Amino acid sequence: MEGDAPQRVSERVSGPGPGGGGGGMIRELCRGFGRHRRYLGQLRQNLRETQKFFRDIKCSHSHSCPSSPAGGGAAELGPAGDVAEAPLPAGQLSCIAFPPKEEKYLQQIVDCLPCILILGQDCNVKCQLLNLLLGVQVLPTTRLGSEENCKLRRLRFTYGTQTRVSLALPGQYELVHTLVAHQGNWDTIPEEDLEVQEDSEDAAHVLAELEVTMHHALLQDVDIVVAPCQGLRPAVDVLGDLVNDFLPVITYALHKDELSERDEQELQEIRKYFSFPIFFFKVPKLGSEIIASSTRRTENERSPLHHQLMDLGYLSSSHCNCGVPGQDTKAQSMLVEQSEKLRHLSTFSHQVLQTHLVDAAKALNRVHCHCLDIFINQAFDMQRDLQITPKRLEYTRKKENELYESLMNIANRKQEEMKDMICETLNTMKGELLDDAANMEFKDVIVPENGEAVGTRELKCCIRQIQELIISRLNQAVANKLISSVDYLRESFVGTLERCLQSLEKSQDVSIHITSNYLKQILNAAYHVEVTFHSGSSVTRMLWEQIKQIIQRITWVNPPTITLEWKRKVAQEAIDSLSASKLAKSICSQFRTRLNSSHEAFAASLRQLEAGHSGRLENTEDLWLKVRKDHAPRLARLSLESRSLQDVLLHRKPKLGQELGRGQYGVVYLCDNWGGHFPCALKSVVPPDEKHWNDLALEFHYMRSLPKHERLVDLHGSVIDYNYGGGSSIAVLLIMERLHRDLYTGLKAGLTLETRLQIALDVVEGIRFLHSQGLVHRDIKLKNVLLDKQNRAKITDLGFCKPEAMMSGSIVGTPIHMAPELFTGKYDNSVDVYAFGILFWYICSGSVKLPEAFERCASKDHLWNNVRRGARPERLPVFDEECWQLMEACWDGDPSQRPLLGIVQPMLQGIMERLCKSNSERPNTGLDDST
């Protein structure tokens, strides 16, 4: 193969002291980069599965995503993870997508492999640092020319089964070029191969890097790049070439006591364009021995290098005098001037790699959590849609029918009233109408002032205008009377009916938005009677017939003159000829006709609207099931993995202490210290199948999403142990707050009545908080109530805790505390009230002895059947009457009859005040061990 050459094993570089460039440091570096490779693989796998998840969402629900921009878009996240998308309508999940910025950033992180970049004050010191890192003399350190004349090309060291040297263009192809190293054995790479020859005219040869493959443990997980001399390519350009494909761990080799002006300029350029920390290491002079401790600087002294780097912004006041940063885990620049402390490079590289992985894991987990929240909110919206839409349709039908019947009753009832009202109006307004008619000025008619007669056409026009005046005044009076009769309807339910219709039509196509129009027509029949008169109605035509008779009676052979008396006479004849009873009958008849027509059209359009909703609700229910059964659990597991990766990177895997207890799905251990929390309890859960994995992941998401509350046990974090039980299984380690004991143990030891009632109040407060967050615990029992050293209670084990919209009706919980409706699969948060009632029985009894009704049951099935038939705990002689009534109310068989916890809490406070604060409490037989 081209480039292979015989070589001798290079001489091993003697370390500068214990922990220096020897095997210990190399092993630490290997472990650090190997750990990064494993965690990067986990991140890469999680990202791939997340991308597949979003692709599946898009493919399976693309039909439900609207094409309009208003339909929603990708769930965008801001720099801090804030939401930047518009809310999605219920059921439109295909619009949920991987935010492009986050996806691009994460893809770049997982594609970038680590690389150690060696910069330095000159090429000799860079080569010397490379030899120290590898522990072998690979590069010459004394034969290279001065920095001014140096032509050192870029060097890349990678892993290979054989040592091999070749020239290659970075990231492209290998050059066919004969090297000195190919011509014989060598201890170190020949200087001629390291430098760009001055007489070289081949541009590719000048740009090429020397690639060295070696069988070395460190190179298995990380490449090492030695930057070329500054004359060939500035360090900032070299770094710019690397950052697109590699994650650089930057080292800067020093051999002088101070930075030169050129060094400072180079470092300023790097800091200007990049934010990477740098590991500054002062390489010992060749052949020098370890400096005696007596000649070292005292701890309070800072070297000139330290001051210069502080001025450049690389070091801060938090760094100790040796240049090592404080306890902050975020990567910071580091200065090491003692050669035996080169081992700090492993700490520095760990911080650099960890910072990038943690940031990536956080970004990925933000995407997971944000989309999970969207799913849960969508589940709530879909569940509400499924519940409320049929009720809205029924309400609309009922209320419209009530409106129709009310208006019809008004039309029937008001006919006689309207007749009397018309007569009364005519009598009241007669004088005013005659005066108005006498004084009116005609439009479009020229009346001679000298008393001359007018033509027949002008006469008819004048008579028509007088008639219109009378009719308009009568119209207004009738309309006002009718409107006042139905004002109550608008105030009572018309507004609610309109809003209900609007909500039903909102999710439907515009073409069927006619139901509201028919409702408006029903209302127009009552509110806009005047429009009927002006639009050529039957009433108007009837009036015109009467007016024609008037015209015939008052028309003479010779046309009259238009005088005040004539106008009064015309108006009088018109008023006298009007029949109040016929007018009232005609008005009400027309009102009923319009009502019937609009009512029938409304009913037909409502049936059409109901049919459209029926198909939509069927699709919504299918989608709701997919969200609960597939989408949310699948994404929750990815979220659990990304969050666990973040936790293990920041805090490492916790150490298991002594076993504290065992449950149905896990073992609880003592954990002394983790993530700054002390002491902790660690619950190890080995999910036996996919369903349990999903349930655990959702539980974790709900717990992490909850704000901290003093009545809930804090969850500090999680770690996935892929080698649990010697590698036989995968376990999820949940690290949480450790408390003193559980309520079961507390009752066995003995607690005073006041303490027990306070515990009951604490439990109610905790359950109320869960319900306020939309969660149902579903497993309230003695073992899931923990007590601190002051005997204050906290609720734990949210394993069965779910939002109401995410509950599938599965039968879960502890049989004794399970409400009867749990067996039907249809239940709500009132099951927690039932469970509290049973818990309160134990609290009031002061013992853990089973109730007789439950103790007689031979099996779970027997117990469940008895509970369904109404079996409940018995009343004990020690029970207070009010306490017993509260228990009975809480475990009522009808969920709707159980009291709300907002009512239970003040009742408990009153009981506690009465029994404990009034000094009327009898001495408790149990022991009070609250300490």
From Swiss-Prot:
The UniProt record lists the keyword Kinase: yes
Keyword Protein biosynthesis: no
Record's catalysed reaction(s): L-seryl-[protein] + ATP = O-phospho-L-seryl-[protein] + ADP + H(+); L-threonyl-[protein] + ATP = O-phospho-L-threonyl-[protein] + ADP + H(+); L-tyrosyl-[protein] + ATP = O-phospho-L-tyrosyl-[protein] + ADP + H(+)
Coiled coil: 397-424
UniProt-listed Enzyme Commission number(s): 2.7.12.1
Gene Ontology process terms (BP): cellular response to fibroblast growth factor stimulus; negative regulation of apoptotic process; positive regulation of ERK1 and ERK2 cascade; positive regulation of fibroblast growth factor receptor signaling pathway; positive regulation of kinase activity
Start and end residues of each stretch annotated as Disordered: 1-24
Binding site for ATP: 660-668, 683
PROSITE patterns (UniProt xref): PROTEIN_KINASE_ATP, PROTEIN_KINASE_DOM, PROTEIN_KINASE_ST
One GO molecular-function entry: ATP binding
Protein's cellular compartments: Cytoplasm; Cell membrane; Apical cell membrane; Basolateral cell membrane
GO cellular component, one term: apical plasma membrane
Transmembrane regions: none
InterPro entries, sorted: Dual_SerThr-Tyr_Kinase (IPR051302), Kinase-like_dom_sf (IPR011009), Prot_kinase_dom (IPR000719), Protein_kinase_ATP_BS (IPR017441), Ser/Thr_kinase_AS (IPR008271)
One Pfam match: Pkinase
Catalytic residues (UniProt): 779
Top-rank taxon: Eukaryota
Keyword set, alphabetical order: ATP-binding, Cell junction, Cell membrane, Coiled coil, Cytoplasm, Kinase, Membrane, Nucleotide-binding, Serine/threonine-protein kinase, Transferase, Tyrosine-protein kinase
Domain Protein kinase: start-end pairs: 654-908
Cited function: Acts as a positive regulator of ERK phosphorylation downstream of fibroblast growth factor-receptor activation. Involved in the regulation of both caspase-dependent apoptosis and caspase-independent cell death. In the skin, it plays a predominant role in suppressing caspase-dependent apoptosis in response to UV stress in a range of dermal cell types.
Family in the record: Belongs to the protein kinase superfamily. Ser/Thr protein kinase family.
Listed name of the protein: Dual serine/threonine and tyrosine protein kinase
